[in-house]
């Protein structure tokens, strides 16, 4: 049965317009949580004729997560997408960071272009989250092998698009838990008078563009401490951050600073913990990542 695309659907139209610059002749993997953003992305891509493999990553962190995953896959198939469910194990510790690492590893494992459904609201939240970690920045539409077609539209568009399509998104209880840093930031933004999302998102986009230029000037990630030590500080720190990101590690101001010291003022420092049960050491003049001892 062909999917139903309503004639009068202004919010779904916004979603469809957002994906058009990113359409590919290849099948793309879309990370599908079952929430409104990712359901709307699958729907918009399919409405524009994009071949989609919707991958539902079940983190197994909540009771009934397997039922949620199966329902998300069912709705994706109704939209004309191929859909599979992948279960992952999330390491203990920083639940947000470790779940993200496991999720992206599962999406990349298919060796296809990967799309995720971050919106303009996510862009604003990410700017503040990264600023709190001492490394403010924004998300680019294409970054580290990930495509984000929805950075130009709002979360309200995806919610209303699902209503227009008679889709039934899952509302993750974790999105209401203030113990998660992103939820706390989101709640704080909602309490600010006016709409802070647009100016924050614009700032994030400018930073992302600046970062792209500086990253090009800095050169590719390297573990060579002598090469890093020879660079100006701003480029060196950016290169260290890129080296961590390449390994699915979120850089923080503290971790970058301590790794930088390993390169520039080496005196036998101990390992630097970088989260996820991992640490960085200097071995033979190079940075080495290993499991915490």
Describe every region a protein language model picked out.
Residues 1-188:
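Core alpha/beta nucleotide-donor-binding catalytic domains of modification enzymes
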Residues 170-173, 194-201, 248-257:
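Short, surface-exposed acidic
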Residues 2-37, 53, 57-59, 88, ...:
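AMP-forming adenylation/ATP pyrophosphatase catalytic core
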